């Protein structure tokens, strides 16, 4: 389980969070600029908290008081950023295996489960928006992460694609049984995908079951 108690001060917002992340899918909502992305970047190791700590089970990832800092590549976190999420000139296979922290068998499993086997050698930039989302999810899952962090995973899709891709993502996340934080500003996704709903308002994360 991920437990955390930290503050991160940034020019745009100060984020304060204190709690634990259980299994299942946690949907984190809030207005643009409220601190949602900063929160998951702290968990991922992409942003350093100003004060506080983050633990995974018995392992301390961050303790600012004790000057402990485990870098992102050693946390085994799957992170799917918002926006441009594939390397367009690399093949689908190379996109998924980019971190080099998984195995060929894992790549084969993901290609099959994500419906991407026939695109293995295809450049990712030539795929549809929904297919690119699946490639990005495959890359995030490739290292068998202890936690999956998705930042607005459906924002790049038009409304016609969102429902199907959302159902596919949720199905795979539950099948792999990996704790997930799903960041969105779309309130309709709360009931559609989440086991619980957290709210980020002016940098304060409100934890609820």
Locations of regions flagged by a protein language model:
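Catalytic Walker B motif of ABC-type/P-loop ATPase nucleotide-binding domains
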Residues: 148-152
């Amino acid at each position: 389980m991920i437990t955390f108690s930290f503050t991160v001060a940034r020019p745009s917002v100060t984020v304060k969070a204190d709690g634990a992340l259980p299994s299942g899918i946690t949907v984190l909502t809030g207005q643009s600029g409220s601190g949602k992305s900063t929160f998951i970047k702290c968990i991922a190791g992409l942003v350093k908290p100003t004060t506080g700590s983050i633990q995974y089970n018995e392992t301390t990832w961050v303790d600012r008081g004790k000057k402990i800092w485990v870098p992102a590549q050693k946390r085994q976190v799957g992170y799917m950023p918002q926006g441009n999420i594939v390397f367009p000139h690399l093949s689908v296979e190379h996109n998924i295996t980019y971190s080099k922290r998984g195995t060929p068998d894992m790549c084969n499993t993901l290609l099959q489960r994500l419906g991407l086997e026939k695109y293995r050698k295809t450049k990712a930039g030539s795929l549809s928006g929904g297919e690119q989302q699946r490639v990005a999810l495959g890359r995030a899952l490739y290292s068998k992460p202890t936690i999956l962090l998705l930042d607005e995973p459906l924002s790049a899709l038009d409304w016609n694609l969102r429902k199907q891709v959302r159902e596919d993502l949720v199905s795979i996340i539950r099948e792999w049984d990996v704790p997930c934080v799903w960041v969105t500003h779309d309130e309709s996704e709360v009931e559609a995908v989440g086991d619980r709903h957290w709210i980020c308002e002016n940098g304060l994360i409100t934890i609820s079951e």
